[in-house]
Amino acid sequence: MPQPNINSVHVDAILTNISVAYLQNQDNFIADKVFPVIPVDKKSDKYFTYTKNDWFRDEAQRRAPGTESAGGGYNLSTGSYSADVWAFHKDVDDQTVANADAPLNPLREATEFVTRRLMLRRELQWVSDFFGTGVWADDVTGVSGAPSSGETKQWSDYTSSDPISDLEAAKAEILGNTGMEANTLVLGYDVFKSLKNHPDLVDRIKYTSSQTITTDMLAAMFDIPRVMVAKAVKATNNEGATEAYGFAHGKKALLCHVAPQPGLLTPSAGYTFAWTGVSGGLGATIGTSQFRMESIKSDRVEAEMAFDNKVISADLGYFWNSIVA
């Protein structure tokens, strides 16, 4: 074989401008985007709530000359929050740092690693606290057969389902019970995938657009200001077992009213109270720190955050479970 050849003129080395890691896009996560995040100075505290019915009764009366006006009042109670502290760390030993080839940067990668793990934990906690049955005033389950009370046809049934009517009924339910209009729709990715191909929805835009249906189009079609798609993915296997993955939010949907800006006398389906004490005063932001573990000749990279997801007004939410097959 003639020399030199292709193998003798080059020794394989690590590329310094590329590496491969599966970092989910931060836009996949919605836990800090759906409901207002309230930074709080104390780990636990209370907030005031008003009795809804007191504000809806018609009790004003005609006033005769020389008489007192009709009067009344409202009941006031308190709710409470208690922020759980979540933390995760990775130790980076000195030998690994000293021996790392470019483009590897073990300390920087450790920061990304622990931050993403906490982002996933926050997302899964949001699902547990807000995106399930028994949380909101109205729960509807999607079924493949004939629906009974509390059920509707799954939106993936393109022949029999009517997602537009289902959403209109849900909007009317929230408005009729609270006087507030729904302004946010959260869809699991599988639900969004089914909706954007539903013939009823495609038919509404076929003469005005040839594009694939987007969240903005759904918002306009449903007259709901915000439509959000939850795309976070989680591993469902234990370490060392066969890899398995799934969408964190499942085949579910939530319609709700969210306060655009939290404040006094401002109803909202939910709030997230974020304790600033563990994140450098940054509220929902994940706080990271790096400190020496001399006993194991390593630097520890640690991430920490503290929050409590609270349903504030259950009647401002309408939830669908198993809404697609």
Residue ranges with predicted function:
Residues M1-V40, L282-A325:
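Protruding loop/beta-arch "assembly-hinge" segments enriched in small, turn-prone residues
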Residues P2-K33, D45-Y50, W136-A169:
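Intrinsically disordered, low-complexity linear regions
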Residues Q24-K90:
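Assembly/oligomerization interface modules of large self-assembling protein complexes
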Residues I38, I174-G179, N183-T184, L218-A219, ...:
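A general structural signal for short secondary-structure junctions and capping/turn motifs
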Residues L76-S80, L201, G240-T242, Y318-W320:
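Membrane-topology and secretion signals of cell-surface/extracellular proteins
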Residues D94-E181, Y189-K206, S322-A325:
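Alpha-helical scaffold segments that mediate packing/assembly in large oligomeric complexes
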Residues P103-F113, R204, K252-L264, G287-S298, ...:
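A binding-site-centric feature that preferentially detects glycan-recognition modules on secreted/surface proteins
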Residues M180-W275:
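Extended oligomerization regions of viral-like shell subunits
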